[in-house]
Curated annotation (Swiss-Prot):
Ribonucleoprotein listed as a keyword: no
GO molecular function annotations of the record: O-acyltransferase activity
Protein name: Membrane-bound O-acyltransferase GUP1
Extracellular-side segments: 1-217, 288-296, 452-464
Disulphide bonds in the chain: none
Annotated family: Belongs to the membrane-bound acyltransferase family.
Protein localization: Cell membrane; Endoplasmic reticulum membrane; Mitochondrion membrane
Job description of the protein: Membrane-bound O-acyltransferase involved in the remodeling of glycosylphosphatidylinositol (GPI) anchors. Acts only on GPI-anchored proteins, but not on free GPI lipids. Also involved in lipid metabolism, having profound effects on sphingolipid-sterol-ordered domains integrity and assembly. Involved in cell integrity and apoptosis.
Active site (UniProt): H392
GN (gene name): GUP1
GO cellular component, one term: endoplasmic reticulum membrane
Classification of source organism: Eukaryota, Fungi, Dikarya, Ascomycota, Saccharomycotina
UniProt topology in membrane: Multi-pass membrane protein
Keyword Transit peptide: no
InterPro entries assigned to the protein according to its UniProt record, in alphabetical order: MB_O-acyltransferase, MBOAT_fam
Length: 505
């Protein structure tokens, strides 16, 4: 598999001149590096600056803790986060919308469907912010100096900041609305800062942590939406969870320094894997130039597969850096990628493991309010994946990707309903493996279409698979390989269950 991807993208391939201009000088064994992905290039080229920012933030935090002693963390987060917020994002209007939003939201409580009003206001704010930023972008004199350094480490564009802020603003205000609707003050915990008597809530319980109503204030609001370690790219943490960990009960996991060090080693290993892939197979450059003419179906499939793996890694690495930063800072956010993308056979489970914190946010604030998995499950899923597509970018291609994912979920839901009464039959596992093979192919095609090869590349792959002898041979061989691989994945999950681990994906 590695060799096929290398043969399709290295110097020996006849299509090499078409994408050679996208390659840069590398550092591994004298080879060039495929640094053509814009998002990851910004992260990779400015990695030392990001590390400097982590060191600066951590040093300031430790210094303030020594000087101020027992104080609320959110005060420091408010000051540091607000500076990063004002100086790093190219969306000049976003800070004003954040402040305006806080002033307007209290009045929404007088509206009968205040949750709908909140969502409508935040979505409209995000869209208006995008419009103003694109048409009236400016750069004030006072922050030009800061931007010359800080903006370099901010690899997301204005849209991503607006939609990310949309998610944070919704979390704060929907948590606030839920709190106002909840029972009397007697339901509150007797929370005291740094109280050792408090029991440690798990990650699900912290979503609805009984935070006092007085904690829903402007300082906490701004501290939350501009919390530096998670500001640039996440993972996403809810307002209740953030305040609970910041001001009431630090998780024991952030005090386990051995665990944090092992997490750092895993992060470093992921970077080395990514560097190896970028130096030895130039699949991103090939996909950008559509330089796959004459490649075999096997090579086309491997171009697509390793493209997806690089997309997975380019998201995993920043998320793990920012989560590592947050762990060092004393906040334990969710892990966004809890499985390798190649270790998935279920469409539903795949999305639980991919961008897990965002998946939880979607379920809590969108999917469940829409009705969840009831009789309108398919329609609710369509709404959710449409939102996810727009969250990535406003493109018809991504909307179609979201709708394809929903269509591909339907067979799995149907098969699960039909065969759920036969789980103890000896043939059940093999039927599941056949379904897994179909799922894997459908997930690959949907993601190749949306993020890698586009319409032309995906159609070219499908055409060669079904209209050529070599394509049909590869198709049937790959089906057999995926069938065996699915059995291995089943057994890996059974081994996890025997150890008491069940991550539901």
């Amino acid at each position: 598999m590695f060799k096929a991807a290398m043969d399709a993208s290295n110097e020996t391939n006849p299509n090499y001149p078409k994408f050679a201009h996208l390659l840069s000088q590398g550092w591994m064994f004298g080879r060039k590096v495929d640094n053509s992905d814009q998002q990851y290039r910004f992260f990779r080229d400015n990695f030392p600056l990001l590390c400097g920012l982590v060191l600066l933030h951590t040093s300031l935090r430790r210094g303030v803790n020594l000087i101020a002693g027992n104080h609320k963390r959110t005060g420091f987060d408010f000051v540091f986060g607000x500076d990063i917020h004002l100086c790093s994002t190219r969306d000049e209007f976003l800070p004003y919308f954040d402040s305006l939003g806080y002033x307007i939201f209290p009045f929404l409580k007088y509206i009968k469907r205040n949750d709908v009003a909140t969502x409508t206001y935040v979505d409209x704010t995000a869209i208006l912010s995008l419009f103003l930023n694109d048409n009236y972008x400016s750069c004030t004199i006072w922050n030009r100096f800061y931007r010359s350094w800080i903006s370099e480490v901010s690899f997301q564009d204005g849209m991503c900041f607006s939609i990310s802020h949309c998610x944070r603003m919704l979390s704060y205000n929907l948590d606030y609305i839920e709190k106002r609707k909840s029972a009397s003050e007697e339901s509150n915990l007797e929370l005291k800062n740094s109280s050792s008597s408090l029991s440690e809530l798990d990650d699900r319980e912290r979503l609805v942590a009984p935070i006092p109503l007085t904690d829903y204030n402007f300082v906490n609001y701004m501290a939350y939406i501009t919390y530096a370690p998670l500001f640039i790219a996440g993972p996403i943490i809810t307002f209740n969870d953030y305040i609970y960990q910041s001001d009431y009960k630090a998780m024991s996991s952030v005090k386990d320094y051995k665990r944090t060090f092992i997490y750092f080693l895993r992060f470093a290993f992921c970077i080395l894997v990514m560097e190896f892939l970028l130096h030895f197979m130039y699949v991103v450059a090939v996909s950008k130039t559509k330089a796959w003419e004459g490649d075999t179906p096997f090579q086309l499939s491997m171009l697509g597969l390793f493209n997806l793996n690089i997309i997975w890694l380019k998201l995993l690495i920043p998320w793990r850096l920012f989560r590592l930063w947050s762990l060092i800072d004393g906040i334990d956010p969710p892990e966004n990628m809890i499985r390798c993308m190649d270790n998935n056979f279920s469409t539903l489970a795949f999305w639980r493991a991919w961008h897990r914190s965002y998946n939880r946010w979607i379920i809590r604030y969108i999917y469940i309010p829409l009705g969840g998995g009831g009789k309108y499950r398919i329609l609710n899923s369509l709404c959710v994946f449409s939102f996810v597509a727009i969250w990535h970018d406003i493109e018809l291609k991504l909307l179609m990707w979201g709708w394809l994912v929903v269509i591909f979920i339907i067979p799995e839901l149907a098969a699960t309903a039909i065969f759920k009464n036969y789980q103890h039959e000896p043939w059940y596992r093999h039927v599941c493996a056949l379904g897994a093979v179909i799922n894997i192919w459908m997930m690959m095609l949907a993601n190749l279409f949306g993020f890698c090869m586009g319409k032309d590349g995906t159609m070219s792959l499908i055409k060669t698979l079904f209209t050529t002898a070599v394509g049909l041979r590869f198709l049937f061989l790959s089906l057999g390989a995926l069938f065996v691989g699915s059995q291995v994945m089943f057994e890996l999950r059974e081994a996890e269950k025997r150890r008491g681990v069940n991550v539901k994906c």
